[in-house]
Amino acid sequence: LYKDILKISVTRPILSIFLVGLLIVGSYTAYFSAKLGVQFFPDIEPEQAVVQILSRGDLSASEKNSLVKDTEASISNLNGVDINFAKTGADGRTKDLVGSVRTIFSDWDERETAADLMESMRGSVKFLEGANINIVAQKEGPGGQGKPVRIEITGTDFDQLNKALFVIRQKMNKIDGFIDISDNLPSPGLEWNLNIDREIAARHGVTVASLGTMVKLLTKGVKVSDYRPDDTDEELEVFLRYIKSERNLDRLQELRVPTSDGRYVPLSVFAELTPEKKGGTISRLDGNRLRSIEANVKEGMQAPFLIEKLKSEIENVTFPKSVSVNFAGEDEDIKETQAFLGQSLVFSLVLMSIVLMIQFNSAWQTIVTMSAIILSTGGIFLLLFLTERPFGVVMSMLGLIALAGIVVNNNIVLIDTFNEYKRKGHNHREAAYMAGLTRFRPVILTAITTILGLVPMVFSLTIRFSERDILVGAPSSQWWVDLSSTIAGGLTFATFLTLIATPALLVIGRTSVFSIKNKLVTLLKTKLSTKTVST
C-alpha cells in the first residue's frame, strides 16, 4: 500500500502536498470551530478544599463562631468529606473573612469527583443567612491559590470606580459560568471620628497627645507599668482602662481631661464626635485607586472563554476616561507564558535550522526537514479535537518544543538517504522513491516505540507493581496528559505525513530549481541575442 501511495507522491508531488495541506488545515479548522479554548495548567484532582465564610458588617465573636460551626456541621455529613479543621477569625489576607473550614477529601477512588463534591458542599451551605460562602479547591502548579478570574478597575474617583464595578458585576451575573464572585468594596458600616479643635485645646493648655491618652482609657487602655512575676522570666504589661460597662460613646463625651491649671474639663469642650461612612482599606495599583473583582469558574468551562464573553459584553459600555479596566488573573498568566514559551520555540527552531543548514548545505532541504514541525501541529490539534481537550499553555507548549526536536529526525533520515542515492547516480524521482521505501520500516518502528512508551501517560494509567493493579485517572497521572498527548498525537500525524510529503517536497524542490534555472538561461540568451542583432 505504501509503495502505491509513494509512487503517486513522487509522480504527482504538487497534488500530494495540496492534499496534505488540506488535511492540516482541516484539523486546525475542526479544533478552532469547536471552541475548546486554552487552559493555563492541567486541572489536577484536588485532595482538599477551604470553605471561606464571609460576612459584611460587624459581627460579635459568638455570632462568628456560630456561623463557622453551622458551616462545619453542614458539610461534615457529606460522602467524600474525611476530615474538617474549623477556624474562627480573619487571616489578615481575605476581606470580610469570618472563619474558614479546611476540608480533606477521602481517597480519590473512593468518592465522587472533587467538582461534584464541592457542588454538593455549596448546596449544603446555601441556606446559611448573613454569610457568603466561597469554596476554594487546592490548586496544583503555577498561578497561586487565587481565583482564575480577576478584573482590576483603576482610576482616581471612587464613585466612578464603584459604578464601573457594579456594571461589570451585573454583566458577570448574566453570563453562565462565573461562580463565587467577590470584590474589594469596603464593608458597610460606620466609623466615629474625633475632630479636635486645636485652638480651644491650646487655650486650656491641653495637648493632642494628652487627649489621645485619655481616649485610650475607653478603648485599648493605657500602659502604666511592667510586672514580672517570680515564677517567670517574661514581663507582663499592665494596662489601665475603664471597665467594660463604661466603655461606650456616651462615656467618651463625658470624659474629663486635666488642663494646665489643674481643672478637669469634659472632652466635648475640645472635640466633636461625628459618625462617617466606613472607608475601608484603600488599594492602589501604579499610583491609581483600585477596585477589583474575582470569580471562580464552573467545572467544565474555561476562564479565557468566559473572559472573552465578558469583554464582548462590556465593549459597548462607556466608562469615564479616568477609569481603566484590566483583566488579570489567569488571563494575564496565559499571555505571559505564551510569550515566553513562544520565544523559546522560535529560538530552538533557529538553532535547529542553523545545524541543518551546516549539515545539508542546502536551504531547500533544511526547509523540508523543518516542515515536519508544521505537520506535527496538525496532529496535535486533531487529537485535542477528538478528545475534546483544550490546548494547555504550559504543558502542551512544552510538549510542542520537545516534539520539534523529535519529528525532524524522520526527515533527517529520509533526506540523508535521498542524498546517498543521488550520489549513486539516481535521478530525483528515483532517489526520493527509493529513500521512502528504504527508510519506511526504521521510521515507523522508531515512532511506534516512542508512542507506545507514552501510552500510559496519554490514558492516565498508573501501574502499581506492588499492588498488582492498574489505576486510571489518578491525580499523579493527570499532570502529564497534555504533555504526552501533544508528543504522541503530533508524532503519529507527522510520521505518516512525512513519509508522503517529504519525498514529494524533494521532487518539487528539484523541479523548481530546474524551472528557475531554465527561465534564467532563456532570459540571458534572449538579451544576448538582442544585443548581437543590434550590433
State what each model feature region is.
Residues 1-39, 151, 527-535:
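Signature of alpha-helical transmembrane segments and their immediate interfacial
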Residues 2-13, 37, 41, 72, ...:
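Alpha-helical membrane-interface segments at transmembrane helix boundaries
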Residues 21-58, 110-112, 145-148, 458-470:
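Transmembrane helices with small-residue packing motifs
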Residues 26, 62-144, 199-220, 228, ...:
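Solvent-exposed, membrane-proximal periplasmic/extracellular interface segments of envelope transport
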Residues 28-30, 47-57, 97-109, 143-163, ...:
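Short, hydrophobic beta-strand segments
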Residues 37-109, 118-123, 158-191:
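Extracytoplasmic/periplasmic
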Residues 169-348, 352, 357-360, 388, ...:
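Extracytoplasmic/periplasmic membrane-proximal domains and adjacent transmembrane bundles
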Residues 354-439, 444-463, 489, 493, ...:
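Hydrophobic transmembrane alpha-helices and their membrane-interface caps
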